[in-house]
Amino acid sequence: MNRKIQSALISVFYKEGLDTLAKTLHNQGVTLYSTGGTRKFIEDLNIPVIAIEDLTSYPSILGGRVKTLHPKVFGGILARREENQDMEELSQFEIPTFDLVIVDLYPFNETVVNGGSESDIIEKIDIGGISLIRAAAKNFKYTTIISDKSDYLKLEGLINSQNGELTINQRKTFATKAFNVSSGYDRDIADWFDGKTKIGLRYGENPHQEAHFKGNLNECFEKIFFC
């Protein structure tokens, strides 16, 4: 089933390429909702955007740790449009539906690789973003999830060529990628807690390939002591 994108929630760490996508959505008449730095970025493009805080009536708290974790956000993402009770509850609590969610994740692995402190690494464990990704991907029947900036151009092309509509197969493709992003992110976090290290190597099986070592070096080599 094709579904037209009429509202979008955007909350991203990396802003590259977001300007043209935001303009495309605006030109299609899509209502935009956003948070913090992303909202300011969109406002600076002279594009109308609604602050999530205005929707939830709660500010961002705990130094930004809690921004989007609210029933008015997740209800609008997870609602099943064909379920009367879902839609009645949205109406009762004045919750808008979100047809599109654009979100990426804090750079956890980059912080580890760059030698960040434990506190810096902990702060880069994304909570709200990963929850948004999973919620939107779960509800792909009604909601499109974009979890990687490399898909911005693809989404723009689909929106422009299909009059703002996406097919269910297209939404499922984006959802599949989103769950891969989510699982890979959690794997990196689990590896770090398990003491495994990701180290960049000079090249892969062939010189043109990128490769990394991931594991506990202490389990791979014998220690040599000099007296």
Q: Residue ranges of each PLM-predicted region?
A:
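Short coil/turn connectors at secondary-structure junctions
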Residues: 3-7, 27-30, 45-48, 70-74, ...
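General beta-strand structural signal in soluble alpha/beta enzymes
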Residues: 10, 31-36, 50-54, 79, ...
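A short, charged helix-loop
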Residues: 100-123, 127-169, 216-224
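Long, structured protein-protein interaction/assembly regions in large complexes
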Residues: 196-227
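Glycine-rich nucleotide/cofactor/substrate-binding loop typically near the N-terminus or early
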Residues: 37-107
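Internal gly/pro-rich beta-alpha loop/helix module
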Residues: 124-125, 143-207
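Short, ordered loop/turn segments at secondary-structure junctions
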Residues: 14-15, 36-40, 53-57, 106, ...
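N-terminal glycine-/serine-/threonine-rich phosphate-binding loop
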Residues: 1-55
